[in-house]
Amino acid sequence: WTKSVQLKTASTSTNIFLTDFRKNKNLASLMKNIGKHHNTPLVNIFKSGYSTALEIKSESNSDFESNNIGFTSSQLESIRAAVDCSVADQALELEDQMGLLATAVSAAPFLGLLGTVWGVMDAFSGMADSGSAALSAVAPGISGALLTTIIGLIVALPSMIGYNLLSSKIRHIAVQMDNFSQEFVSKISNENNFWED
């Protein structure tokens, strides 16, 4: 449930931030107002790219604000690498705890099957103890077998549906992160007056 809320918040906040990013031609003013945005994947990617660009700018001999000199291709590659690392970190954070759900999807049917086999063995044991194949001898084992099968399915089916829905949301946000990283680097490389207030 918490993963669903996390992804819903991330998706909504991502769309809001993306709209602001596209409307705002000035990174510095966007960074000044970053506090109004939730701490979501795109905001974290932006912060990483922005801070890397500022480091490169401060290390450069050129004054970007006064003579509108853009980044060199090697500087852009450094920014792109920082943004790509941030995208990977955010993807890992989004996928956190999904392994637990995947394990439930995979393991529950097998636990149900184990219970079924155990119940059938119990039914045969009941037949052997009573010396007959009467319903009263096999019913407890069969009912136990069916119960564990039902429990396994009750766990597996909702887990599978939840896993698939959450995975779909994660893929959607991951695509947005990849697209944003390209858009961010492209915007920096195409706008020489990007840093002016």
Question: Residue ranges of each PLM-predicted region?
Answer:
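Hydrophobic alpha-helical transmembrane segments and adjacent short intramembrane/lumenal linkers
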Residues: G131-A145
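Hydrophobic positions within alpha-helical transmembrane segments of bacterial inner-membrane proteins
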Residues: P109-V120, T149, L153-I161
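Hydrophobic aliphatic residue packing
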Residues: V117-V120, V138, I142, V155, ...
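Hydrophobic alpha-helical membrane-embedded segments
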Residues: W1-Q6
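Predominantly long cytosolic amphipathic alpha-helical stalk/bundle segments
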Residues: T9-F110, D122-A134, I161-D197
